[in-house]
Amino acid sequence: MPVSTLCWHLARRPEGIPGPSDFVLREMPLPPLPRGQVELEVHGLSVDPYMRTRMQPQGYGYLAKWGPGTPLSAWGLARIRRSRGRWREGDWVVGHLPVANRVHVRVPEPDALLPLCLPAATPLPGRWLHEHGMTGFTAWLGMRHYGRPQPGETVLVSAAAGAVGSLAVQLAHRAGARVIASAGSAAKRTWLRERLGVVATLDDRDPEGFAEALAEAAPEGIDLDFESLGGAVFEAAIERLRPCGRVVLCGLISQYHDPEPRRAPPNLARLQAIGGRLVPFVVPGHEPEHWARFQAEMAGLDPVAPLDVLHGLEAWPRAFCGLFTGKGIGKRVVRLGCQSALSAAW
C-alpha cells in the first residue's frame, strides 16, 4: 500500500496578521526511501515568529521563501524510523523538518540534523524545542557570543517575555548584568519582574511613552540592546546607548507583517557618533562551530522556560497565528501524537 504523509503548505501569502485560511493541509505520497536518506517520525515542532518573514515576497533573504503551494518547515524533534544511511534506526534527532505528521517524513541526511543528546538533568523532549533547541541557540548566540554582557552593565531586552527574549534575559542575568525588559502586556511585565527578576519593565506597545520610560529606568544609559522588536523601541534604545555601546540585532518583529523590506531607525547614524557597534546576526551556519558549547552552557543555566504546548498537527495554523496576538509567555510548540518513551511528559 502506498505510504503518504500530511504536510502543511502555504495556501496564499498573508496580508497583515496571518489567519488559518492562509494555510492548507495536504496529503503527500512518500517515494521509496533512497540510499543515503532517513525516514523520520516527527514528534514535535517549534512555532516561531521568523516564519512570517518567509511568507513575504521580498527581503529576508537568508532563508528560502514560501510561495503559495510551498510546504512549510520548522525546527523539529523526530525519531529515525528507517535509515539507509549512517544513522541508526530509533535514534532521536533535531533539525529543520517539514511541518508534517508523525507517520513518515523523509528528509536527506544533512549536517543540519543533530543527534539528540540532552544532558541527564534535562530529560524532557520539549526542551529540545526551547532552551536546548534553536530558540535557546538564538538567545545564546545573540547574548553570550555576540553581546557579551559584563558584570554591572545595563542591558535592554525587547520582546522579553517571548521564547528568545526570556532566555536572553536570563543569560544576561547570569553574566551579572542589570536587565531592563520590555513587553506588551501588564501580565507579561509582572511575570518578568516576579519570575525573572528584571530591575524594570517597559510597555513596548506605548511608542509615545517608551523613550521617557527607558530614560527613567536607565538614567545613565544602556550598554547593550538585545533587539527583537524594532520600530520606536529600537529608536529609543539607540538614543539611550552609552558611548561604545552595542546593539545585537536579533529580529524586527514589528515589521514582519509588512511586505516591504525592513527599515532602519532614523537615528541609526548615532551609533557612529558614539562609537557604538551594531551586530546583526542570523542563526543558520553557526551550528557546527558553536552547538556543543551552547549545549554545555545551557545545561548549567537551568532557566525558567515555560512551554505553551498545542496538540496535533491540525493545531499548527492556530499555534502560529496565535503568536501575533501578544498574549503568550515563553515558547509555543506543537506536539504530535506519537507514542514513544519520550511521550509521557514534556
What function would you assign to each model-found segment?
Residues 3, 287-346:
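C-terminal hydrophobic helical "lid"/dimerization subdomain
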Residues 30-47, 55-99:
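Glycine-rich beta-strand-centered segment in the early N-terminal region that forms part
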Residues 72-79, 86, 91-159:
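NAD(P)H dinucleotide-binding glycine-rich loop of Rossmann-like/cofactor-binding domains
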Residues 129-207:
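Mid-domain Rossmann-like dinucleotide-binding core that forms the NAD(H)/NADP(H) cofactor-binding site
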Residues 143, 168-169, 189, 234, ...:
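Generic hydrophobic/aromatic pocket-lining and core-packing "Φ" positions
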Residues 208-219:
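Short amphipathic alpha-helix with an adjacent loop that forms part of the alpha/beta core around
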Residues 232-302, 337-346:
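Glycine-rich phosphate-binding loop and adjacent beta-alpha segment
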